Structures are given as structure tokens and as C-alpha cells.
UniProtKB/Swiss-Prot annotation:
Gene: rnp2
Subunit structure: Consists of a catalytic RNA component and at least 4-5 protein subunits.
EC number: 3.1.26.5
Gene Ontology MF terms in the entry: ribonuclease P activity
GO CC terms: cytoplasm; ribonuclease P complex
Top-level EC class as recorded in UniProt: hydrolase
Name assigned to this protein: Ribonuclease P protein component 2
Locations listed in the record: Cytoplasm
Gene Ontology terms: biological process: tRNA 5'-leader removal
Catalytic function, reaction form: Endonucleolytic cleavage of RNA, removing 5'-extranucleotides from tRNA precursor
């Protein structure tokens, strides 16, 4: 029988922050387009090492309201917000990504910043 590895106590786990964002563009965008744009701009701006340290992770995107959630390390929130503002083109069409807010939990992020867009 294989034993499960022990889980890390909360004091040793990575502290994450969740960033809510909204995309405004010439046309509606799909989830994969947004994910690729965030990843590409992050690599260009922060480099491979900076991106690895910031740990940006695409959580969710609603294609109807064009809003989504990105997770990152708490020390690199400003860098990821900067990366989001640098996105000017997604898949050949112009776009603007606006940061709605930052929170420590997805539940609180949805309540504070994404409730007006119909998130539950």
C-alpha cells in the first residue's frame, strides 16, 4: 500500500492572491485566447525566472461577461497587475484588460468584485 504524503501546514504553504479582471475589446474573446495572451505577455515582461516566481495561474473566465480570475504569489501581485495592463492585443484584435480587484480567497473576490457581473 502506498502512503499519501503529508500535507503542508498552512504556515509553510505558498500564500496566493486572486486578481479579478475584465477584458474589453473589438470582439468577444475565448478562454484559451486570454490564457495565451496572459502567458505570452508575462514571459515577455517578467522573463522566465520572474514568471516562475510570480506563479501566474489562470483560474476561470466567463465568456459572456468577459471577466476572469488569475492566481499569483502574494509577493508578485503588482507585477501580474502590470502584466495584465500591458495586454493590448489578443489574437490580432485590440483589447484592454482592466483589473477589478485583488483578494486572498476566490469566494471573497466573487462577492466584492464579480457579483455585478453575475458571478455566484
Amino acid at each position: 500500500m502506498r502512503r499519501k504524503p503529508k500535507t503542508l501546514p498552512p504556515t509553510l504553504r505558498d500564500k496566493n492572491r486572486y486578481i479579478a479582471f475584465q477584458v474589453t475589446g473589438e470582439r468577444p474573446f475565448k478562454k484559451e485566447m486570454i490564457k495565451k495572451a496572459i502567458w505570452d505577455v508575462s514571459l515577455k515582461t517578467l522573463g522566465e525566472l520572474g514568471t516562475a516566481r510570480a506563479k501566474p495561474w489562470f483560474i476561470k473566465f466567463d465568456e459572456k461577461t468577459q471577466t476572469g480570475i488569475v492566481r499569483c504569489d502574494r509577493k508578485y501581485v503588482e507585477e501580474i497587475r502590470f502584466v495584465l495592463t500591458l495586454i493590448t492585443e489578443i489574437n490580432g484584435s485590440k483589447a484592454i484588460v482592466r483589473t477589478l480587484g485583488v483578494s486572498g480567497t476566490i469566494k471573497r473576490l466573487k462577492m466584492k468584485f464579480l457579483k455585478e457581473f453575475g458571478w455566484k
